[in-house]
Amino acid sequence: MLKVIENCCDKSYLDMLKYAAQESNGWNLTYPLGYSFEDKHLKLTLIENEPVNELIAGMAMGLLIQIYNSKTESGVPASDFFYPEVLYCGISVKDKNRLDNPHTDHENDTGIIKILGLLNSNWNKKDGGAFIHGDETVHLKPTNFVIFDPRIIHHADKITTHEKRLGIDFTVKRKNNV
């Protein structure tokens, strides 16, 4: 399952969230779990069952509600796919100096889906970093988010610009009808 939610927020909201994340001192090199230090990327954990960074977690929840109230490219309400109850939310940094690792998440948990989008309001297709999910590729546009099954191999394609790409991801409970 891979669904694109289009134009679900304002670019200025993404800019505000990106700025707050950039100014945070809570960044870590925990992920991906089990990998060597050289293969890890920066991650800012906002919610891990409860808020870790209350200010930015609140901003992220505001974004999630905007996504929840939006529709897919085919007109299906995003609210048909998930409950807006966050199990995890984080912001990651990717750049052209590190290839992303193809991986799966929550392999044994069928009740989970993930939502991913970019905080870079100026990101273009030419900048690279498309989202690859199984055999599907989505060029992430600012204000668009993807809802996807994390048990399918996924990763970011090569980034071609010098700019760092900030992505926000939510782990939420899947609705039974999905």
Give the role of each language-model region.
Residues 69-178:
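Catalytic core of non-heme Fe(II) oxygenases with the double-stranded beta-helix
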Residues 1-79:
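Non-heme Fe(II)/2-oxoglutarate
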